[in-house]
């Protein structure tokens, strides 16, 4: 993924070589629109060109596009569920339920889409040049529904139904539709995107209209990218996946497979917690645990003692104030009696 400084260098080099038109076409920027924003950009020097190009927001848009196009594309071959997220972030998709089909791109896409939807929307809003309020946006089984279609020949399809629960649901749907569709043009993994925005009326609120984005993403490519790894490495990764997914002696298999009726009770994060990871002797391990508990008790005792001292100090101050008020009251009574 190109960083912002690298994109600035690309813009500067295009100005040096006077190949600005080719640069704009390669990056899907309309020369006429750029000319309306940056007047006579063909005749500006390199420093003015870079400054005006950045001021117009094009470098920010190109940086956001780079972040979106890297979405779910880079795969760690040691762990195929460790994928590239939005921008520089790496996301581990292995937490949660174990599914033998997770190595497929549509499973990874759905898992990463659900995990990073807010980051995707914020990046897409910068790419579009509009700010979207994501503060009150919440995701549950009603607002975000995803499914993987059955595998047909070489077509792999994922369906996403997104129903924002905020006032600006239309702008969110339009931003997500336009910018993800734009980003998919630059990705190696996506062949087709079909999307539509459906207006729907909320129940018992006939005067308000909310919007739903119904998007179908089709994938047409092999398990790993051809230009990144050899065929032998592909086979090795595939064998490791098959081995870890289908061996019955793998504890993750029986705990997270769909055949286990109690699989929903378990989570991979807290699977088999290790109480004594350093393998200390039992006596030493218990002694360390007792010392740790003693330190915790001492800390609580000091805290409670301080609270008692503060309470006693507050009580003394209250008693002193009562005495002063009593003396003042007696003086006022004496003065009143003297007047009578």
Swiss-Prot record:
Superkingdom assignment: Viruses
Protein name as it appears in the record: Uncharacterized 39.7 kDa protein in nrdC-mobD intergenic region
Source species: Enterobacteria phage T4 (Bacteriophage T4)
Lineage of origin: Viruses, Duplodnaviria, Heunggongvirae, Uroviricota, Caudoviricetes
Gene: y05A
